[in-house]
Every structure is written in structure tokens, then in C-alpha cells.
Amino acid sequence: MITVNVDLGDRAYPIHIGAGLIGRTELFAPHIKGSSVTIVTNTTVDPLYGDALRAALAPLGKRVSTVVLPDGEAYKNWETLNLIFDGLLTDHADRKTTLVALGGGVVGDMTGFAAACYMRGVPFIQVPTTLLSQVDSSVGGKTGINHPLGKNMIGAFYQPQAVIADIGALTTLPDRELAAGVAEVIKTGAIADAEFFDWIEANVEALNRREPAALAHAVKRSCEIKASVVAADEREGGLRAILNFGHTFGHAIEAGLGYGEWLHGEAVGCGMVMAGDLSVRLGLLDEASRQRLDAVIAAAHLPTRAPALGDARYMDLMRVDKKAEAGAIKFILLKRFGDTLITQAPDEAVFATLAQTTR
């Protein structure tokens, strides 16, 4: 087992990475202070790992209940969030009840948001079961739900007590979900660590084959990078925005097609292709680096051509973005691997990128 720490002073927490961790009682025990635990999971994950988690919690002598949500990005909304609150209230959960998010990014984001809101804040633990959630969404305290007009526009910054990333859970992940997680690994290397990006290029096939050593290194290094960024800028006042490379275009794709049509990581992968194209058009990135970026995204079996939503639709969707200010779209662009720029772009350049990268 490897442990990475997120250094946030008195709100610091560990990220435990390894195989077989869901069943390890001692990883949960230090973080559960009250008399009850509510597991939040979904209809796909509960049959796979719910019993193992409940068995791990049993020796603690806590009252354990489970809320099972429908699976998918399409359910990341108020109605599904209320299912969590319904369960907490029905079970008479109190301020010391610990929520445990068992699932991917949707479960983690919604459980964290519920924890932030219920009784104005109860503790929660992340147990991410997808590669995307292990390398990205479970770390850093971003929680929330989608709105029909924009992704993740309603939420809170609320840190977990711990992240327990069991890479053994990745063996049951569908291929599309695995690729979606590799997209976030690629993003992390591209924005923050050129050597890690080199490693990803050399090992993308090992990741595709789910080789445990490759997966463990990808999760570890991604978490190290994200932990350092979050420690420096917890509430996305500046530096943390670089983690949104590929997300301005990607969120527009998700909202434009309807949440769930493309996986989040698929949209981010294609969004990075689009951001790379725009980076070259603005004279920030060299063509050879753009080609390397596109090649590794394609090698991860991610889409590299965006849906043709129309220029006006893309622009409208990108203006409904957390980075936008006074309606001005902000992009995270590459200067070189490991170096980014947060900037606006002329509409003509954005239109040229859309013409080049959409079907």
C-alpha cells in the first residue's frame, strides 16, 4: 500500500492506494467517530463491492445503512441527491454520522455534497472504484451536482476524511470507463509533469491492459500532483484551475449532448485535443507536442473528434463555465508539457479550432 497525504493543515487527509483495500477495517477505523455509517453507492457497484465494505465496517460495531442510487451521469441532479437526504433522515443520521462514498465520480461528488449540506456538515470518506475517481475526482474536495445548463455548477468545496483507492476494483471496470480514467491521467501529466507525460506515452498500453504496477503508478503520481495543487490552492483561486485542461470544451460536449451520452473522461480527452489545437493556433504550443498529445489520447481509445453542435451552441455552453468571468470564456492552454496558461482566446481562433476538431 502507498499513502499520499493532502496537506491542508487541520483538514489534512491520507490517500491510501493499493489492492484489496476495501476490506481493510483498519483503514476506516480512525476516521469514523460516531455510532453510525451511511454507505452511498449505486446499482452497479453495490453488488460488486458493497458486501466487502459492509464486512470491513462490521467489526467497528457501528450501525451501518446503505443508500443505493441509480447509476450514471444523467442522475447527478437534485432528485438523486434527495435520495441521500431521504436515507439519512429516515435512519435518523446525526452530526457524527459518517458517509462513505463507494463508487465513481458521480457517487463521490454527490455524497460529498450531501455531507457538506446535511446538518451543515458531516464527515465522509471516499472509496473510489473507477480510475477517473481514483486519480482525480475523489481528491481535493470538489463536490456537487449538474444543472441542465451547466456541469458541476451547484456544489461546495468539502474535504473528505480519507480516500481509500482500491486498484483491485479496476478489474471490473468497463473498457470505456477505464479509458475515461486514463484521460485524466494524461491531463495530469500534460499540465504538470513532462516526465510523467513521457511515462504515460510509454505505458499507455500497459494501462489499457490494466497491469497492476502501471495502474498503481498512474494513480500514485496523479494523486501526488493533484494533492500538491490542492494544498497550494484549495478553492480554485488561481493555480488549481490548471486541472481543468480540456474541461472547457469537454463540459460543453457533455452538456450539449446531454449528460451521460459521453463519459466525462471521454469528453475531457476530446477537449484536450481541442485545447491542444487552440494552443497551437495561439502560438503557445509547438505542432510536434500537439501531435504527441493527440496520439496518446487516441492510443487510450478516447474520442478525438468532437460532436458538431455548432459554433454558437459551443460558445453559449462554454460561457456557462465556472472559469468564465462576465461572459468571457477562459481556456486552460498548453505552452509545453508541464506548463500551462489560463487565458481568453479570440472568437476567430476558437471557431477555427471547432472547424478542425468537430465532425
Swiss-Prot record:
The keyword Isomerase does not apply. It is found in: Cytoplasm. Keywords: Amino-acid biosynthesis, Aromatic amino acid biosynthesis, Cobalt, Cytoplasm, Lyase, Metal-binding, NAD, Nucleotide-binding, Zinc. Zn(2+) binds at E184, H247, H264. GO terms for molecular function: 3-dehydroquinate synthase activity; metal ion binding; nucleotide binding. Its cofactor is Co(2+); Zn(2+); NAD(+). It holds the Pfam family DHQS_C. Its EC number is 4.2.3.4. NAD(+) binds at residues 71-76, 105-109, 129-130, 142, 151. It comes from the Bacteria. It catalyses: 7-phospho-2-dehydro-3-deoxy-D-arabino-heptonate = 3-dehydroquinate + phosphate. Pathway: Metabolic intermediate biosynthesis; chorismate biosynthesis; chorismate from D-erythrose 4-phosphate and phosphoenolpyruvate: step 2/7. One of its GO terms (cellular component) is cytoplasm. Belongs to the sugar phosphate cyclases superfamily. Dehydroquinate synthase family. This is 3-dehydroquinate synthase. It comes from Burkholderia cenocepacia (strain ATCC BAA-245 / DSM 16553 / LMG 16656 / NCTC 13227 / J2315 / CF5610) (Burkholderia cepacia (strain J2315)). The lineage of its organism: Bacteria, Pseudomonadati, Pseudomonadota, Betaproteobacteria, Burkholderiales.
